Amino acid sequence: MKRFALLLITILVLAALIAPNAMAEKQYKIAFLPKIIGNTFFEVAGAHAVDMGKQLGVEVTYDGPAVASVAEQVKFINTFVNQGYDAIVVSALDPNGLNQALKRAMSKGVVIVTWDSDVDPHYRTFYVNQGTPDILGRVLVDMVATQLPDPQQKIKVAFHYSSPTVTDQNSWAKFAEKIVASEYKNWEILTWQYSEMDFPKAVSVGEQLLKTYPDVNAIICPDSTAFPGQAKAIENLNMGGKVIVVGFTTPSTISQYIKRGTVVKGALWDCGVQGAAGVYTAYKLLKGEEIKVGSSFAIPGIQGEFKVVPNRMQGGDMYEKSDLSDAKDNGIILLPERLIFTKDNIDQYKF
């Protein structure tokens, strides 16, 4: 009997020692889903997302559609859910097109975080955001204004980006339009053009824009594919120095156009930091750590504080009229800084 009791005690002690370690060794699986693969912006973000996973001891899979397709993104979400992923970090091609797939994922306990481009807040927890529309719309307009002898002079402006439905780019472009209407009343907006994140199409659309509107003075491209595509179109038509073109893309993508003088200024944020932050946010939530609107947090190895702000800061009905507009456990996580690239600093950036 004594031997049995000793054996039982030994088993219980071993179980007590093993159980915490077993729990600690739980390895989460996080899917990192871009709008499209093969694009430098998303490849850099994906690489840093995977690296952050390694730092955290988390399995991170970077994969997504080869073409910019909402239907393809839905397929990837469903596949990740069926494969047992614990979290999905997604850059959405459409604010509503992924809702049902994300709803299904959340019903199965999958943590949803968005990055770069958001969905309806009801279908995610937090949005890792490069900057609210007022911040990024201002960056776009300022890059044009600072290249003019007189910012209040009469000019003709065009917008060229990926799609009329993509959440992020439209919010920045629409806020830029508001700034133009209120602060630069002599700027006339001629047209809005879209090239669906396809570089050859961006060049073609860019050339057609220049031919259709030969008097255009500035083209604003809040899209990492349209911006270099428009710059290439300007070079193809030998219009370098005649048209201001600004926008968002990686420094490695726009560098050649800046060095040739076709582009004077471009901008972005560190998309690698954004990718890493998306995975880190999902990891915190999986571990049960609270993220509260109004707070801020640091990420090891990344400079600056990540502020957590209310959904309403993003602007628009989807945010301002939502019952989650001022939620405390559902909101927007802002990157610490934005970057402006010129010929003087372009070589400092390695992404």
What name fits each language-model region?
Residues 1-8:
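Bacterial N-terminal signal peptides that target proteins for export
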Residues 15-22:
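C-terminal segment of classical bacterial N-terminal signal peptides
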Residues 11-12:
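Repetitive helical segments and hydrophobic/amphipathic motifs
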Residues 23-351:
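A residue-level marker of the well-folded mature domains of exported/periplasmic proteins
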